[in-house]
Amino acid sequence: MFSFNMFDHPIPRVFQNRFSTQYRCFSVSMLAGPNDRSDVEKGGKIIMPPSALDQLSRLNITYPMLFKLTNKNSDRMTHCGVLEFVADEGICYLPHWMMQNLLLEEGGLVQVESVNLQVATYSKFQPQSPDFLDITNPKAVLENALRNFACLTTGDVIAINYNEKIYELRVMETKPDKAVSIIECDMNVDFDAPLGYKEPERPVQHEESIEGEADHSGYAGEVGFRAFSGSGNRLDGKKKGVEPSPSPIKPGDIKRGIPNYEFKLGKITFIRNSRPLVKKVEEDEAGGRFIAFSGEGQSLRKKGRKP
């Protein structure tokens, strides 16, 4: 008994309402067509031939359609969704990062099987480069990128495109299973330290000893102007009823303050006033005081003086 296959591609097999077949896989960049399909590279979905849609429509397949991809030569497997059914017969197109996980080359054989996966509740990722820390809000970026994915598999290294740069993330853990569906799910996301990341060394801070007297060298400045520092005189020549004003202050006594540029937040410094007290001056001698209207007057009309 002989069997003939008139097609160059394998015929899909159906076992107990399960889709299972083999395809020659190629990267999305080799997909023929006028439109740029770079959007497929940004997600976790594949492009299958129309015959697969015909077979799947006859089966009692639960939606969304999820598939398990297996490379039997390297014993590597992953999970994915389907984006379109426009590939040539016997061929499927995969994102480049998915082919790297499966260790597949262009034109290699991959086993495609339909599966049902549980909805994800938790996932943990490890960035493969410290450059991922440059992203301001990594959770928001990851949430936006995962909209193009249908499922996650523990151990996979997925690639996301952000700000014209490719970031790779390893799926460290998924719950409740090692392969989960992330379509319409409420999933908690956590991050591991990036691969090759080192904690920055913090400088050792030595406690500064508190000196007995404050150092005023940083507050030295030019001599300031002091208003109303002179002495006054009364018209009647009498002595003022208050104590005499102090002598002019020496240039070194009053100095303009300079801000302390070495001030540290949270540190309180009690500065002692080490300036000497102003000494009182003695009263001026009586003869040395100014007496108003003490001169001689002159008259325009000369009068004889009485003896």
Curated annotation (Swiss-Prot):
Q: Does the keyword Phosphoprotein apply?
A: yes
Q: Which GO terms describe its molecular function?
A: K48-linked polyubiquitin modification-dependent protein binding
Q: Which residue ranges does the record annotate as region Disordered?
A: 230-255, 288-307
**Keywords of the record:** Acetylation, Cytoplasm, Nucleus, Phosphoprotein, Ubl conjugation pathway
Question: What Pfam families does the database record attribute to this sequence?
Answer: UFD1_N1 (PF03152), UFD1_N2 (PF24842)
Q: Where in the cell is it found?
A: Nucleus; Cytoplasm, Cytosol
Give all Phosphoserine modified positions: 129, 231, 245, 247, 299
Record-level GO BP terms: cellular response to misfolded protein; ERAD pathway; negative regulation of RIG-I signaling pathway; negative regulation of type I interferon production; proteasome-mediated ubiquitin-dependent protein catabolic process; retrograde protein transport, ER to cytosol; ubiquitin-dependent protein catabolic process
Keyword Nucleus among UniProt keywords = yes
Q: In which pathway does it act?
A: Protein degradation; proteasomal ubiquitin-dependent pathway
Q: What does this protein do?
A: Essential component of the ubiquitin-dependent proteolytic pathway which degrades ubiquitin fusion proteins. The ternary complex containing UFD1, VCP and NPLOC4 binds ubiquitinated proteins and is necessary for the export of misfolded proteins from the ER to the cytoplasm, where they are degraded by the proteasome. The NPLOC4-UFD1-VCP complex regulates spindle disassembly at the end of mitosis and is necessary for the formation of a closed nuclear envelope. It may be involved in the development of some ectoderm-derived structures.
Q: Which family does it belong to?
A: Belongs to the UFD1 family.
Record-given protein name: Ubiquitin recognition factor in ER-associated degradation protein 1
What is the species of this protein? Mus musculus
